[in-house]
């Protein structure tokens, strides 16, 4: 399929490059560094070769979210966004941008989002899970009350917010002791991000801000296939408190969330996701440079789904969600 839009596609700046070192074997690190720092060369050639018209670029993980010092987090977020704006300006026909945000400081994050959207032309934000602040030992999740004004501005700006994974903090990772292979994208990423998304749903956030659009990668971090059970078992809880939100989890999932195919290239999983959340809320992504563009594209181009759904997922859903036809 030609003309695809891909939207979980990462880059790095020198200050955040090392954050990605632990996710690949040592003998592959040199190649990954090249992939993360390159935008205009290898990346663009692969896009051309595999029918990707547009990439929406975002900073690698955890990057800004793992900088407990507020001032430093604000500085790195702003620098990353400025670098990305310059790169996108070189090829505005091929590259768009997600803002990195210093959510250690909700007011600063709000201001940076406003700057990126209004002044730099970014199409949304991608945030790498919870943020660390102060001593770095307490994760800040975005259902907390201090983030409500931030979410109000996201809704006002009418841009999507991509909740990208990161590993849990060491003190919250004891279940993985002795099993480090379960950390990262193998399992811990999905578990951490799914719980964060459920917290957002349960908090009442989407009752207060019903026009928010949240994106989850990796075919929804396992949530599409658990929504029925989550609501079914929660309904058995007869005694208050249950949760502050007014509706079922599945209602928020189906109305406020979108999912991407990033790093999850399995047809059975895609078909189940279509049955659960609908083809209108699924978007193509590759997860470059941690996955290969040819693998993602070859699978998607050949996967056994309706051609109308392929066009939606590969292109038109993203163009609608990010309002690309008016750019």
From Swiss-Prot:
Keywords on record: Decarboxylase, Lyase, Metal-binding, Zinc
pH-linked activity: Optimum pH is 7.0 for decarboxylation.
Necessary cofactors: Zn(2+)
Gene3D superfamilies: Metal-dependent hydrolases (3.20.20.140)
EC number of this enzyme: 4.1.1.103
Summary of activators and inhibitors of this protein: Insensitive to oxygen. Decarboxylation and carboxylation are inhibited by AgNO(3) and by diethyl pyrocarbonate, a histidine residue-specific inhibitor. Decarboxylation is also inhibited by HgCl(2) and activated by MgCl(2).
Pathway, per record: Aromatic compound metabolism
GO biological process: secondary metabolic process
GO cellular component, one term: cytosol
EC primary class: lyase
Thermal properties: Optimum temperature is 60 degrees Celsius for decarboxylation. Optimum temperature is 45 degrees Celsius for carboxylation.
A GO molecular-function descriptor: metal ion binding
Residues involved in Zn(2+) binding: 8, 10, 164, 287
Cofactor note as given: Binds 1 Zn(2+) ion per subunit.
Catalytic residue list: 287
Catalytic activity annotation: 2,6-dihydroxybenzoate + H(+) = resorcinol + CO2; 2,3-dihydroxybenzoate + H(+) = catechol + CO2
Known role: Involved in the gamma-resorcylate (2,6-dihydroxybenzoate) catabolism. Catalyzes the reversible decarboxylation of gamma-resorcylate to resorcinol. Also catalyzes the decarboxylation of 2,3-dihydroxybenzoate to catechol, but does not act on 2-hydroxybenzoic acid 3-hydroxybenzoic acid, 4-hydroxybenzoic acid, 3,4-dihydroxybenzoic acid, 2,5-dihydroxybenzoic acid, 2,3,4-trihydroxybenzoic acid, 3,4,5-trihydroxybenzoic acid, 4-aminobenzoic acid, o-hydroxyphenylacetic acid and vanillic acid. Resorcinol and catechol can both be carboxylated by the reverse reaction.
Family, per entry: Belongs to the metallo-dependent hydrolases superfamily. ACMSD family.
Protein name, per record: Gamma-resorcylate decarboxylase
Phylogenetic classification of the source organism: Bacteria, Pseudomonadati, Pseudomonadota, Alphaproteobacteria, Hyphomicrobiales
